[in-house]
Amino acid sequence: MDETLRKRLESARLYLCTDARADRGDLAEFLDAALAGGVDIVQLRDKTLDARDELAALEVVREACDRHGALLAVNDRADIAHAVNADVLHLGQRDLPVRYARAILGDRPLIGRSTNAAELSAAADREEGVDYFCIGPVWATPTKPGRPAAGLDEVARVAALHPQRPWFAIGGINEDNLDQVLAAGARRAVVVRAITEAEDPRAAAAELKRRLVAAAAA
């Protein structure tokens, strides 16, 4: 395991998931703004892309992350993560098993897991080859249609487990409800629309990051 990546993960607070913004054509500019605001990890998550277009978009994300010292995450695809030398591969509960992802990627990249219940979070915290996990969706969100909300109680249950690995709350989190997530015990968050739909992505990211850092230091 790359210890530098592990340390960067441990210090990360704000994780952004974005699509390729093909309808706006501003992916590079958007990423520069969000990363300047304090985003630590960027995951490209765009189910509309074929592999070639995803690789092209990831080149843009890679360059932006390198400019700002952020981690690049790939969703689901170990082969694509390998192709772009991603820092992070994020796997859902029904995606490629971790042992197979490690066989493709080796030890360097970080691997994350999605969970929607404290019991699954506890299992991910113990799973060999996993470096972090997410719990959610905290609130129902259009980015996960049909997925029932785990709720703040589930975030609190995970926090009470005192996981050994870094973990993030995810799902419907924004400036208006972040304080509830922090009160439940989370100290890291994954956001989508809170930044992707913001009029000022840099300012939105900066405010979220400020509150996450303050909570972690308290």
UniProtKB/Swiss-Prot annotation:
Catalytic reactions of this protein: 2-[(2R,5Z)-2-carboxy-4-methylthiazol-5(2H)-ylidene]ethyl phosphate + 4-amino-2-methyl-5-(diphosphooxymethyl)pyrimidine + 2 H(+) = thiamine phosphate + CO2 + diphosphate; 2-(2-carboxy-4-methylthiazol-5-yl)ethyl phosphate + 4-amino-2-methyl-5-(diphosphooxymethyl)pyrimidine + 2 H(+) = thiamine phosphate + CO2 + diphosphate; 4-methyl-5-(2-phosphooxyethyl)-thiazole + 4-amino-2-methyl-5-(diphosphooxymethyl)pyrimidine + H(+) = thiamine phosphate + diphosphate
Top-tier EC class: transferase
Binding positions for 4-amino-2-methyl-5-(diphosphooxymethyl)pyrimidine per the UniProt entry: 43-47, 75, 114, 144
SUPFAM superfamilies: Thiamin phosphate synthase
Protein name in the entry: Thiamine-phosphate synthase
Family recorded in the similarity comment: Belongs to the thiamine-phosphate synthase family.
GO molecular function, one term: thiamine-phosphate diphosphorylase activity
Pathway stated in the Swiss-Prot or TrEMBL entry: Cofactor biosynthesis; thiamine diphosphate biosynthesis; thiamine phosphate from 4-amino-2-methyl-5-diphosphomethylpyrimidine and 4-methyl-5-(2-phosphoethyl)-thiazole: step 1/1
Cofactor binding, note field: Binds 1 Mg(2+) ion per subunit.
Protein's job: Condenses 4-methyl-5-(beta-hydroxyethyl)thiazole monophosphate (THZ-P) and 2-methyl-4-amino-5-hydroxymethyl pyrimidine pyrophosphate (HMP-PP) to form thiamine monophosphate (TMP).
GO CC annotation, single: cytoplasm
Binding site for Mg(2+): 76, 95
Necessary cofactors: Mg(2+)
Listed GO biological process terms: thiamine biosynthetic process; thiamine diphosphate biosynthetic process
EC number: 2.5.1.3
Presence of keyword Metal-binding: yes
Protein's UniProt keywords contain Magnesium: yes
InterPro entries named in the record: Aldolase_TIM, ThiamineP_synth_sf, ThiamineP_synth_TenI, TMP_synthase
Annotated 2-[(2R,5Z)-2-carboxy-4-methylthiazol-5(2H)-ylidene]ethyl phosphate binding sites: 141-143, 172
Keywords annotated in UniProt: Magnesium, Metal-binding, Thiamine biosynthesis, Transferase
